[in-house]
């Protein structure tokens, strides 16, 4: 299955001209508010043949035949439109290894290349529509049959930029703004504006955080529903369920531990990151500090800030060293743990 790309189209211009555009491009199945790419850049029915290994094999064989037929040279393409069937049959009698169905597919693909520049629908659609399928993803919620200035649909793998450029050539007085976003949230997203067949404005999110927020807006997602949370620096989103950390008790409160050297870029907003220093012999943790250079013993994540006072660190005794409880939690589970405990207490009450 492909990655789905959501497309939002906003139209600006004379309402009657917009209505005319929507009538021209509508899908016969879905009506006003939908788009049929064939109404904008039509695809020949002869291209609608099987795309895959059988066609590839047949095309290779048919090209071998053309080399033999033209003596590996060139010939006027008009003459190649009327190749005698007898010539093909002579070649096939010599090549008994060829499957007849693959031969016919290859022959059709070769003719499509000659006439349309692509062997099958697949390559033609990628080249002429910018995506491999027609628009899809319609529902009663996304098609507005009354208001006439917004379109919503999905495409496979990529946005249909050639289609929209052609559409604004067909209707030069209408300005079209196109926003798109891949379901791989934060990737393959942006905004183009078109008028009179020309792209007049481009926008791409500048940061990872901006890209995630842009995509979530188009898909109508809450980042938290995708287990994504903005990091403490506000520069990127962190997946809360990808990695597990060791559970510890630190200064009498639950915390998480990892051997890695974390920064605020690695933890979600609402949590705090500190560092453990181990003794010179590496036998025990001797302190927790905001930053540790030498003898770094690991990073800890807490739900509350630690007050280090004037000293700038907190030393451990044998009784106050971090206690490893033996469990593991993701960042998401750690964030939710207090809420779960409160819920359990309420149930007991």
Residue ranges: model-predicted function:
Residues 1-271, 275-283, 293-301, 309, ...:
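Intrinsic low-complexity, intrinsically disordered or marginally ordered coil/linker segments
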């Amino acid at each position: 299955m492909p990655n789905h790309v959501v497309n939002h189209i906003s139209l600006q211009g004379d309402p009657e001209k917009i209505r005319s555009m929507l009538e021209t491009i509508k899908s016969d199945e879905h009506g006003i508010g939908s788009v049929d790419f064939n109404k904008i850049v039509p695809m020949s029915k002869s291209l609608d043949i099987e795309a895959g290994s059988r066609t590839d094999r047949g095309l290779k064989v048919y090209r071998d035949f053309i080399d033999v037929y033209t003596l590996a040279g060139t010939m006027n393409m008009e003459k190649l439109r009327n190749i005698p069937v007898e010539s093909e049959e002579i070649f096939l009698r010599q090549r008994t290894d060829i499957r007849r169905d693959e031969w016919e597919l290859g022959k059709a693909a070769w003719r499509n290349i000659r006439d349309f520049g692509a062997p099958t629908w697949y390559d033609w659609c990628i080249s002429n529509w910018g995506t491999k399928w027609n628009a899809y993803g319609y529902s009663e919620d996304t098609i507005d049959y009354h208001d006439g200035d917004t379109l919503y649909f999905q495409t496979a793998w990529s946005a249909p930029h050639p289609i929209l450029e052609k559409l604004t050539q067909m209707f030069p007085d209408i300005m079209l703004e196109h926003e798109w976003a891949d379901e791989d949230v934060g990737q393959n997203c942006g905004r183009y504006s078109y008028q009179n067949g020309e792209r007049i404005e481009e926008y791409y999110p500048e940061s990872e955080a901006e890209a995630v927020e842009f995509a979530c807006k188009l898909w109508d997602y809450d980042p938290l529903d995708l287990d994504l949370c903005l990091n403490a620096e506000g520069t990127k989103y962190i997946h809360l369920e990808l990695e597990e950390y060791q559970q510890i008790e630190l200064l009498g409160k639950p915390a998480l531990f990892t051997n890695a050297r974390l920064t605020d870029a690695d933890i979600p907003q609402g949590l705090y990151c500190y560092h453990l220093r181990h003794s010179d012999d590496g036998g025990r943790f001797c302190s927790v500090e905001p930053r540790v250079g030498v003898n770094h013993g690991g990073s800890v994540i807490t739900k509350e800030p630690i007050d280090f006072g004037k000293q700038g660190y907190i030393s451990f005794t044998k009784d106050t060293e971090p206690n490893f409880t033996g469990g593991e939690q993701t960042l998401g589970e750690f964030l939710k743990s207090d809420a779960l405990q409160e819920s359990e207490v309420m149930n007991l009450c």
